[in-house]
From Swiss-Prot:
Domain spans labelled UVR: 259-294
Subcellular location, principal: cytoplasm
Subcellular localization(s) per the UniProt record: Cytoplasm
BP term (GO), one: nucleotide-excision repair
Taxonomy, superkingdom: Bacteria
Region (Disordered): 1-20
Subunit structure: Interacts with UvrB in an incision complex.
CC per GO annotation: cytoplasm; excinuclease repair complex
Protein keywords: Cytoplasm, DNA damage, DNA excision, DNA repair, Excision nuclease, SOS response
Pfam families, per the entry: GIY-YIG, HHH_5, UVR, UvrC_RNaseH, UvrC_RNaseH_dom
Disulphide-bridged cysteine pairs: none
Biased composition (Basic and acidic residues): 1-14
UniProt name for this protein: UvrABC system protein C
């Protein structure tokens, strides 16, 4: 039977739309330890020796360590008096490298500042320089030392997953550990790119995207079947053999055999036309159009590059942009721009080399890495990545041909992305200066935190915090707060905001104390603070912006006063104006009457943008919590049943209801379910 011989009777409805499944849930995401060789080392703790140096710091204290260092490869850490890691480095010879620091002759101000702040060092000796490089990259990502080149926005990449653990495989977006059986395609540059591709692939191959439990409980096809986005295998609208053909075609397309798939579909369309089956021919036509839509969004699809990541670096205005393009199976899966923190005095080769080592610390490595320019220790880096991947990884700088065109295109994108960022940073700086003037701040704020709540009649209440700074929104600093208190009256926004403030600033005091990081850094760095770009983003806010009026501000100020930090943080309230019109907002600042800003004031637009962003984040967090609550399973209530066992039980029995009816002997047959766990599940459903 043809995969497209489907029943045409309208059997689904709008209320039958299946719940979306997204395997990107960060709560379920596993942490993947980087694979590779075991790093054998001998730890040498020189801290007691440094402590005997009677308060010596800088080159003087480093000199006391050099004579006892081995002439062997390894990794070193430089730390200040507070125990903060300043720098992590690797060396072919620890003795020779540290001797350079001990001599007190520095090539740059950055190294001079770093050495002057050093009060102790720690060392790890490795078997090879390759192991030292891998360990260095891992430590830099974990410790984020001030004076290293640091990656930012290092979220893992999303993939497309075609499952292999069900008779009717589904297509999903996946991020995190590849623990589920199936075929993974990617990486993609963004979750949006994955979503668009999956939408087009569903139109082309009619693959399901519902949960297994939803699939098992269907008695009629859902809405996706009616709009020709699914073949309806759940209710037998297509045979298992026919559906398997569609899955095989999807795998061929994602594996780079797109021309073969398009040729076969085109031939089937021609045959349907000759048979005067124009309805079926139209379905094939739409499938071809969907495939063309996927490829039109891929841009460059090289003929001679099957699998490669392309990197290009551009430096300008004291900042760096590294553009990355991903090519798999001859297809362009997108690109992403990175803006690592790096001293402007560093050469591009050093920045790019350090970036690559950190980039692949926890990501799969392709067979080819193409660079716009060479990097330091390029051969060593290639050997290290090959060791980690368990196969040959080639790093090259193309000089001609299609590969050179790819690196040139990446370099052009890097230039344009950095140009846009420099323009945005300049504009952001002017806005922050205007913000400080408008609200009477001594200097432009470095960290602004914006807060809001979202709920429906008090249910699934969520507090949200977004963060903005000189470079715009800092999304890796965003936080959400699930409202926990049972004493808050449903819908009590004041009570919710009190809980959010208490949790946020109590934790901040516990983790960072009552010391302003900016002030401490300034005192330490002295006159060189202007040049020290390596300082981390501050944890303490200069300003908190509350979406609310006088009542909200009263609650917030009381919390800040109770915690003893009312004078540390400037709190500003923003209330919707008359008729809730944008432009009529009123602002509440301590010591001043409420006031409004001129309708066309750039600072007003800036504050509105901050408020809109926290609205978006709060509403999205609330919807996610509400959705999770709606699809909650009785299995979630059983202690000891986590996501893995829950998935195994649902795969075996189809539904939670079927699990509740199962005997202990049947439960024990499921992979991962011991006799003890089986009794736990059985007793949960059969307690009188």
């Amino acid at each position: 039977m043809s995969p497209l011989d489907q029943k045409n009777k309208p059997r689904g409805g709008a209320d039958d739309l299946p719940p979306e499944i997204d395997l990107e849930d960060e709560a379920l995401e596993e942490i993947v330890e980087p694979t590779g060789p075991d790093v054998a080392f001998t730890a040498i703790d020189w801290t007691p020796h440094a402590g005997d140096a009677e308060g010596m710091v800088g080159a003087e204290v480093i000199q006391t360590l050099v004579k006892r260092l081995p002439n062997a490869p390894g990794v070193y850490r430089m730390m200040n008096a507070a125990g903060d890691v300043l720098y992590v480095g690797k060396a072919r010879s620890l003795k020779k490298r540290v001797t350079n620091y001990a001599q007190g002759r520095f090539h740059t101000n950055r190294i001079g500042r770093m050495v002057r702040e050093t009060s102790t060092m720690e060392f790890v000796v490795t078997r090879t320089e390759i192991e030292a490089l891998l360990l260095e990259a891992n430590l830099i990502k974990r410790l984020r030392p001030r004076f290293n080149v640091l990656m930012r926005d290092d979220k893992s990449f999303p993939y497309i997953l075609l499952t292999g653990d069900h008779v009717s495989p589904g297509i999903y977006k996946h991020r995190g550990a590849r623990s589920r059986k199936g075929d993974y395609f990617g990486p993609f540059a963004s979750a949006g790119a994955v979503g668009r591709t999956i939408n087009s692939l569903q139109r082309a191959f009619l693959l399901r995207s519902c949960t297994n439990s939803f699939y098992e409980n269907r008695t009629r096809p859902c809405l996706l079947y009616q709009i020709k986005r699914c073949a309806g295998p759940c209710t037998g609208e297509i045979s298992h053999e026919g559906y398997a053909e569609l899955v095989a075609e999807a795998k061929d397309f994602l594996s780079g055999r797109s021309q073969k798939v398009k040729t076969e579909i085109s031939a089937a369309m021609q045959q349907a036309s000759e048979d005067l089956d124009f309805e079926r021919a139209a379905i094939y036509r739409d499938r071809l159009a969907a495939l063309s839509h996927v490829q039109s969004h891929q841009g460059i699809n090289p003929a001679t590059v099957d699998e490669a990541d392309v990197f290009a670096i551009h430096q300008e205005g004291g900042q760096v942009c590294i553009q990355v393009f991903f090519f798999r199976t001859g297809q362009n899966w997108g690109n992403r721009a990175y803006f690592p923190k790096a001293d402007p005095a560093l050469e591009a080769a050093e920045v790019l080399g350090s970036f690559l080592a950190q980039f692949y610390d926890d990501k799969p490595t392709p067979r080819n890495i193409l660079l716009s320019r060479g990097v330091e220790d390029q051969e060593l880096l290639g050997e290290a990545l090959s060791t980690r991947a368990g196969r040959k990884v080639t790093i090259s700088v193309p000089q001609r041909g299609e590969k050179k065109d790819l690196t040139d295109n990446a370099l052009q994108n890097a230039r344009e992305a950095l140009g846009r960022r420099l323009a945005e940073t300049s504009t952001q700086g002017r806005l922050l200066a205007g913000f400080a003037e408008t609200f009477g701040l001594a200097k432009p704020p470095v960290r602004i935190e914006v807060y809001d709540n979202s709920h429906i009649m008090g249910t699934n209440a969520v507090g949200a915090m977004v963060v903005a700074g000189p470079e715009g929104f800092v999304k890796n600093q965003y936080r959400k707060f699930n409202i926990r208190s049972t004493e808050i009256t449903p819908g009590d926004d004041f009570g919710m905001m009190r809980e959010v403030m208490e949790r946020r600033f109590s934790r901040l005091l516990k983790e960072h104390g009552d010391v302003a990081p900016n002030d401490a850094a300034s005192a330490e760095a002295g006159d060189d603070i202007e040049d020290d770009i390596s300082g981390s983003f501050p944890a303490w806010p200069d300003v908190i912006l509350i979406d609310g009026g006088q009542g909200q501000m009263t609650a917030v100020r009381k919390i800040l006063a109770d915690l003893g930090i009312e004078d540390r943080v400037v709190a500003i309230g923003i209330a919707k104006g008359q008729d809730r019109d944008a432009g009529r907002e009123r602002f509440f600042v301590k010591g001043r009457d409420s006031f409004s800003l001129p309708v066309r004031d750039p600072v007003l637009y800036f504050v509105q943008r901050l408020r809109d962003e926290v609205h978006r984040f709060a509403i999205g967090s609330h919807r996610a919590r509400r959705k999770k609550e709606m699809v909650k399973s009785p299995l979630d209530e059983i202690a000891g049943i986590g996501p893995g066992r829950k998935r195994a039980l649902l795969l075996a029995f189809g539904t939670a209801k079927a699990v509740s009816r199962a005997a202990i002997e049947d439960l024990r047959k499921v992979d991962g379910i011991s006799e003890q766990v089986a009794k736990l599940v059985y007793n949960h459903f059969h307690e009188s």
